[in-house]
Amino acid sequence: MGEVVTGEGYAVGTLDDLGEGPGFRKVRAPLGVTAFGVNAVVIPPGIESGRHFHDEQEELYFVHQGEVEFVFGDGEQRHRLGPGGIARVDPRTVRQIRNVGDDDAIYVCVGGKDGYVGRDGRVPEGEENRARPIAS
């Protein structure tokens, strides 16, 4: 296991830097995140999370690896997602995540309270914000 590297205004690391084995990998504190909650979760095959909901926190899930099934509400609504899959869930919606694949599933969950900042990104003075080949 390595370690998260921090600098002035940034932090970088890997999932392995945040822990080993199945379960929650807390991202917020090690990377110094203050604006929202974020965790990475590793679920072994055939394992499901507990059902839960939140009072205020909307959540966005991004499936990085494996195949998961999201179970919503009373269990009648089920949706399978593989790598690159995204799900957004209202705070009060009961949800459960199940690993229905043959390998470990890894997903990232980001949560926050209502309120949109809007587009506030800016380009440093004298630079262009465009995709271009990497300069060697």
Question: Which residues make up each language-model segment?
Answer:
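Short, charged/polar surface micro-motifs in flexible loops or helix N-caps
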Residues: 34-36, 44-48, 67-69, 113-116
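Short histidine-centered beta-strand/loop micro-motifs
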Residues: 28-30, 49-55, 72, 79-80, ...
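Conserved short histidine dyad/triad with adjacent acidic residue
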Residues: 24, 39-55
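A short beta-strand-loop-beta hairpin characteristic of the jelly-roll/cupin
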Residues: 54-83, 93
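Ligand-binding loop in jelly-roll beta-barrel domains
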Residues: 69, 83, 91-117
